[in-house]
């Protein structure tokens, strides 16, 4: 049986017609120049007047039906109105037009059969063309005709023109591609939108002390701590060491909050009266709107807050009791940090929260989402036929874009162009493709199903040449429990335009993150917790937009869960380390071959070079840097000409064991049977045992260095101290060049002068003691 050919996971360069012309890598300057032009027939139905009544009451319930071939679009209808206003736009794709005439019919809504009021017919050959930046076409009044072409009472105001996707009416228009979608919510879910991430702040709560607490049991020393609640986040201080009614903590707690501030900060002072029982001694609520905002580490004024206590009275009523207890705190919003909501490796924005600290932008990123090909069926329609309703989401900085959804197509064409301001070239733009599962009543029939992932592409801006248009077809890869799968390809056009080359070069000398991350850094555990909270806030806020950018989409774009354990990813990282060290290992092997005179000519040349450098040591550093310069110039001919893309071999996705993939997709905590968990635990113990051995060996070598002067082995330390004294005397009376010359000739000596036994220094080092004898 013949094996199927391997899937093509490579990146392909393309030559599309962008902006009406072929791209050759030169700079283009026209609007929508990174996408292919798509022709549409636009019909703007503005209003009607003096419509005749069709009912017994002499009134009408009018609506307009726009018909082009087999496509029909209808406006909303009005009840009992003879002068209705619609102001709706219909867009028909010119590629699918199979008619010669456009018909706009005004009808009267009825229970049995809608009555014809009148119509207007247009010959497609007579319709004008309009392309921005031309002004919008002015609508005109058209007299209605009956089915025989006779003029009837009533007029309809219309504007009809041929245009492209660059038209201002395009985003909000009804599209013939989505003629099968009905319902206001479903139509809103298929339109292109731009979203903005909420402005995130770090909230620092410095709990200093409390005074005059009133515990219920005055015969014991209270164990007091403070619980701080901010939305869904809750942190607590340690139990105060001063077990009294005036406890002290001086402890910092960090939270993530988003503008607009909707919830107050809740502080609760509690006494641990039993192992699983805490008693509330007082509470206070602090509105965030009135807190200080600081942009550096200048001290914030501390404040005393009164504590209140709610007591449940007879009848279940809550009574608020005010007493003299107070809590002393410093609370501020930190504007000098960048709130991390993305994976640190794929950050698209590194600016601080405070806009006052932002530097000017250094360029513009332009992205053209052209089309996708070969998409896989993501769901089944009625009758069992597979279908895909694909849309794209791109994120860079605080701006998210969502393209329109192309209904029932495995080769969707979007041809939408977007721009972002760039403040740092060492950032990443992420483009994801998803299947829209909220159409055709998807929210009801599918139980609110999630939008399925089709794939994702990341492009690092620093890998792009300035002012060059990159047009490539990227593979869309998704890792399943059964292995990596190609879901199709997405065709993108990308251009990074630099406004100031000098400013961009200067950025490479600046720290990646704002100053506060280095002057007063947060701990790793704090950053992990704050990143998790930030992603939750962003996904919640974007889910509340209209139409929503759903939680599963946001989390996939932000790489939530990428820090979880994965055997496949661990192997990939190990081989990445080996790839980095391979150059050093290759140099070591090359030097070893020189030392054993494997190639006598090369060894002689190295001897000559060594002697020159010993005689003229001032040439060492210039020689090294000149060598690196020549290597860089030599490699320029073979520099990468394409952006990097997902590499299945580097990720070990093409060779991962099914059980390893099943473990990677396991929930946390695990949901697998106990025997499988036991097997994986034993495997992890085996791997950890080998790592433990390697770490122990490294610790042993370090401890041997420490024992040289520790007198743990008195004879070894005595020998080393005596050797140091002799070496100091010899090096003092001998010129350095002579010493270096002697050491070099000894290292490069001929194999006939070598012994296969280990050297004396190595034998001495291996005999030194380590602390392994003290290990249990």
From Swiss-Prot:
It is a multi-pass membrane protein. Highly expressed in both vegetative and inflorescence shoot apical meristems (SAMs). Accumulates in root meristems. Observed in flowers. Residues 22-142, 181-305, 346-474 form the C2 domain. Residues 1-16 have a biased composition (Basic and acidic residues). Its main location: endoplasmic reticulum. InterPro entries: C2_dom, C2_domain_sf, C2B_MCTP_PRT_plant, C2C_MCTP_PRT_plant, C2D_MCTP_PRT_plant, MCTP_C, QUIRKY-like. It is found in: Endoplasmic reticulum membrane; Cytoplasm; Vesicle; Cell membrane. The chain crosses the membrane at residues 577-597, 608-628, 719-739. One of its GO terms (biological process) is shoot apical meristem development. Required for proliferation and differentiation of shoot stem cells in the shoot apical meristem (SAM), thus determining the appropriate balance between the maintenance of shoot stem cells and their differentiation into other aboveground plant parts via the control of subcellular localization and intercellular trafficking of STM in the shoot apex. Prevents intracellular trafficking of STM to the plasma membrane in cells in the peripheral shoot meristem region thus facilitating STM recycling to the nucleus to maintain stem cells. This is FT-interacting protein 4. It comes from Arabidopsis thaliana.
């Amino acid at each position: 049986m013949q094996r199927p050919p391997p899937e093509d996971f490579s990146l392909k360069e393309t030559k599309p017609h962008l902006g009406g012309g072929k791209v050759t890598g030169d700079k283009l300057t026209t609007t929508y120049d990174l996408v292919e032009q798509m022709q549409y027939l636009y019909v703007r139905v503005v209003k009607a007047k003096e419509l005749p009544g069709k009912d017994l009451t002499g009134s009408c319930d009018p609506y307009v039906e726009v018909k082009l071939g087999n496509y029909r679009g209808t406006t909303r209808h009005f009840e009992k109105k003879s002068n209705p206003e619609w102001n709706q736009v219909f867009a028909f794709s010119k590629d699918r037009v199979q008619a010669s005439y456009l018909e706009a019919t005004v009808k009267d809504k009825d229970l049995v059969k809608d009555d014809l009021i009148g119509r207007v017919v247009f010959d497609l050959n007579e319709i004008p063309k309009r392309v921005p930046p031309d002004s919008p076409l002015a609508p005109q009044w058209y007299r209605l005709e009956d089915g025989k072409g006779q003029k009837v009472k009533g007029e309809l105001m219309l504007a009809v023109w041929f245009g492209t996707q660059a038209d201002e009416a395009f985003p909000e228009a009804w599209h013939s591609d989505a003629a099968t979608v009905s319902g206001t919510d479903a139509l809103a879910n298929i339109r292109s939108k731009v979203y903005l991430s909420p402005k995130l702040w770090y909230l620092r709560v410095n709990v200093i002390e409390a005074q005059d607490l009133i515990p219920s049991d005055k015969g014991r020393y209270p164990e007091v701590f403070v619980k701080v609640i901010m939305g869904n986040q809750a942190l607590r201080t340690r139990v105060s060491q001063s077990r009294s009614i005036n406890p002290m903590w001086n402890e910092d707690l960090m939270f993530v909050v988003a503008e607009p501030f909707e919830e107050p900060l809740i502080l609760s002072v509690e006494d641990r009266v039993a192992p699983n029982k805490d008693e509330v001694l007082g509470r206070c609520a602090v509105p965030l709107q009135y807190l200080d905002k600081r942009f550096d580490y200048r001290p914030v004024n501390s404040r005393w807050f009164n504590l209140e206590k709610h007591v449940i009275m007879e009848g279940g009523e809550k009574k608020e009791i005010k007493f003299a207890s107070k809590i002393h705190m410093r609370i501020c919003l930190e504007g000098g940090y960048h709130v991390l909501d993305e994976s640190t490796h794929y950050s698209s924005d590194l600016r601080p929260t405070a806009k006052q600290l932002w530097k000017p932008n250094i360029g513009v990123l332009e992205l053209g989402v052209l089309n996708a090909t070969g998409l896989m069926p993501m769901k089944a329609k009625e009758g069992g036929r597979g279908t895909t309703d694909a849309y794209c989401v791109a994120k860079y900085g605080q701006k998210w874009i969502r393209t329109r959804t192309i209904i029932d197509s495995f080769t969707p064409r979007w041809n939408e162009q977007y721009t972002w301001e760039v403040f740092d070239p060492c950032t990443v733009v992420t483009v994801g493709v998803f299947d829209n599962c909220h159409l055709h009543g998807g929210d009801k029939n599918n139980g609110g199903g999630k939008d399925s992932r089709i794939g994702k592409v990341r492009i690092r801006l620093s890998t792009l040449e300035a002012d060059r248009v990159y047009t490539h077809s990227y593979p869309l890869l998704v890792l399943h429990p059964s292995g990596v799968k190609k879901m199709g390809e997405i065709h993108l056009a990308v251009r990074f335009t630099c406004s100031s080359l000098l400013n961009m070069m200067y950025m490479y000398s600046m720290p990646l993150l704002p100053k506060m991350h280095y002057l007063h850094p947060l701990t790793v555990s704090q950053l992990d917790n704050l990143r998790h909270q930030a992603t939750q806030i962003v996904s919640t806020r974007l889910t509340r937009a209209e139409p929503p950018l759903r939680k599963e989409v946001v989390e996939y774009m932000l790489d939530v869960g990428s820090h979880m354990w994965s055997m496949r990813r661990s192997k990939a990282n190990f081989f990445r380390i080996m790839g980095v060290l391979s150059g050093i290992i290759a140099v070591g092997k090359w030097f070893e071959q020189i030392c054993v005179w494997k190639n006598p000519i090369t060894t002689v040349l190295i001897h000559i070079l060594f002697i020159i450098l010993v005689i003229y040591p001032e040439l060492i550093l210039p020689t090294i840097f000149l060598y690196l310069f020549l290597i860089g110039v030599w490699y320029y001919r073979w520099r990468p000409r394409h952006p990097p893309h997902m590499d299945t071999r580097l990720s070990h996705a093409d060779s991962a064991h099914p059980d390893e993939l099943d473990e990677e997709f396991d929930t946390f905590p695990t949901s697998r049977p106990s025997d499988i968990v036991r097997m994986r635990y034993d495997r992890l113990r085996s791997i950890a045992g080998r790592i433990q051995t390697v770490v122990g060996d490294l610790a042993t070598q370090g401890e041997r260095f420490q024992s040289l002067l520790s007198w743990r082995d008195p004879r070894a330390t005595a020998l080393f101290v005596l050797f140091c004294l002799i070496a100091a005397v010899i090096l003092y009376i001998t010129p350095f060049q002579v010493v270096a010359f002697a050491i070099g000739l000894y290292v490069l000596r001929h194999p006939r002068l070598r012994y296969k036994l280990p050297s004396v220094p190595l034998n001495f080092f291996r005999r030194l003691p380590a602390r392994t004898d003290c290990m249990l």
